[in-house]
């Protein structure tokens, strides 16, 4: 499990964040390092000092394949991988997505309580409401 020393070394080399599909250790120390980190839990065990490990290869993290050149976007809610080949198309859609989310937020604040898509899923049996 990576911990505060590993994150400090990553920060010292210019890293701006750390994402792992494994647990991490030394939570208080990690917070003190100040490098944002995402993991799947906490564990007091030390990392392997002699491997296994590979650098520069595709990796599966959280069920997603991550390749060199991919963009990683992360916040408090989680981590998203944007494949390098799709970066331009994703960027092209950002304004439309922001506008749709802003419009939906305004509708919900005004009292909106259901979406037709959800009702359609309930009506055609693709979703079930549990009272």
Q: Can you say where each PLM-predicted feature lies in the sequence?
A:
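Feature captures the catalytic cores and cofactor-binding loops of soluble hydro-lyases/lyases
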Residues: 1-68, 82-131
């Amino acid at each position: 499990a990576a911990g505060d020393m590993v994150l400090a070394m990553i920060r010292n080399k210019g890293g701006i964040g750390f994402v792992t599909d494994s647990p991490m250790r030394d939570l208080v120390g990690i917070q003190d390092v100040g490098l944002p980190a995402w993991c799947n839990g906490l564990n007091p065990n030390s990392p392997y000092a002699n491997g296994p490990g590979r650098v520069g290869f595709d990796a599966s993290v959280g069920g997603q394949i991550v390749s060199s050149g991919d963009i990683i976007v992360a916040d408090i809610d989680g981590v998203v991988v944007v494949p390098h080949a799709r970066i331009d198309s994703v960027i092209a859609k950002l304004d439309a997505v922001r506008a749709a989310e802003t419009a939906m937020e305004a509708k919900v604040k005004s009292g909106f309580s259901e979406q037709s898509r959800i009702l359609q899923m309930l009506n055609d049996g693709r979703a079930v409401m549990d009272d």
